[in-house]
Amino acid sequence: MENYGDIKTIRKRKRYLKRLYRQCQNQIELETIGWSLIANIELLHYYTHLGNFSVTGDIGRILNECAVLIRDIKYKKLNGILRQDEPYMDENYLSFLMSLANYVADGNLQRFESQIGNSFDRTSAMNGAKHFYAFLQDEAISPVAEQILSDTSSIYFCECRNKKDHLGSTFFDYIFHKPYICILEHHDLRDLFTLIRECALGVKFYMKEDLHCDSFQKVCAYVMEELAFSYFETNETHREDIELLKKQRESDFTGYANDTLMQIHSLPGQQNLKSFFHPNVNEILKVIPRQLKKDLVEIQAYVMARGLVQQIQFNKELGLEHLKTLMRMNISNEQRPDFEKIGLGDDVLLTLAQEMSMRSKNVYSRYHEKKR
């Protein structure tokens, strides 16, 4: 039986890191320890909040909320000191990101909730993820993915208690030099693709162990998920369920883009600016909060992933090389990021977003025709 990560180990690491943090006098080392401490606290937060309490109903909810509140109070100050970075933004970049989001949001406004039919256990998810990364046959990615997936003590499985809960997260420990993967189990095919996606973030961590995670780190996760969809479809594995998952992904980002744009367009009214009904980019830039900037960049990351998948499908060696270049890239928050050298300039991304919008509409049209 596999020895997966458990809550006792998280708490033991947290106590050790907390002691290190209190004793440390070196500012650089203090930041490294601080990020690792946050990673373990967030992992504990995630693991406890979702899977530790066996009590259900209102009492279980109250216990969860109390545990989260207490833990938040304990590390809120530390979290605030370290998490100060935000994506670079100027008028031109904001205008570009909003255009990109508009295309993605135009895909289809209807929310889609997938119903995955076949059951899937942990062993099947682990084996499937290993087979996929071995199939990739990349000398930089495949061995690291195998290393991550073989270290089961750093993989945490939590029971899903709410259908609205997200699927997984990865936390980075710079003291123990390890990524911790947490999977919210649905006991179906989603667990496999969540594991593949989170493992990709672990690979990026080993390629470039950077304290300040850039806003584009999830590109590699989206790329691996898309490649995995194609791999398992080609092998005639759960094709109907995979088709549902792909529709779900389209739906999620269409909704995400719509929600982001709605919040952005409501900002001038909230700030009592004059141009409430027709805000310009300059006015939005003055009031847009850090989280909405991150949301816009996340949409760009999703479009970039689609572009890299197309590159890999056309020329596997070149496409994977571009992906690895991105994974190792130093992306500054002091200037606008430039992805021309990996074939993802602004014009390319806008064209990709338009194509995604049209494909999304066609997918939904065919889906509803089948249901009639």
For every predicted segment, state its role.
Residues 1-92:
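N-terminal helix-rich structural modules
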Residues 13, 72-83, 105, 271-372:
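C-terminal, non-catalytic "cap/extension" segments appended to globular domains
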Residues 50-179:
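Contiguous, non-catalytic segments that form substrate-binding/exosite surfaces or channel walls
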Residues 77-84, 139, 143, 206-211, ...:
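Inter-helical turn/loop segments and adjacent helix faces that build the functional surface
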Residues 111-118, 176-188, 205-214, 284-290:
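Glycine- and acidic
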Residues 183-209, 218-221, 226:
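Active-site recognition of the HExxH zinc-binding catalytic motif
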Residues 208-256, 301, 342:
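Post-HExxH zinc-binding segment in Zn-dependent metallohydrolases
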Residues 230-291, 324-328:
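Acidic/His/Gly-enriched intrinsically disordered linker/tail segments
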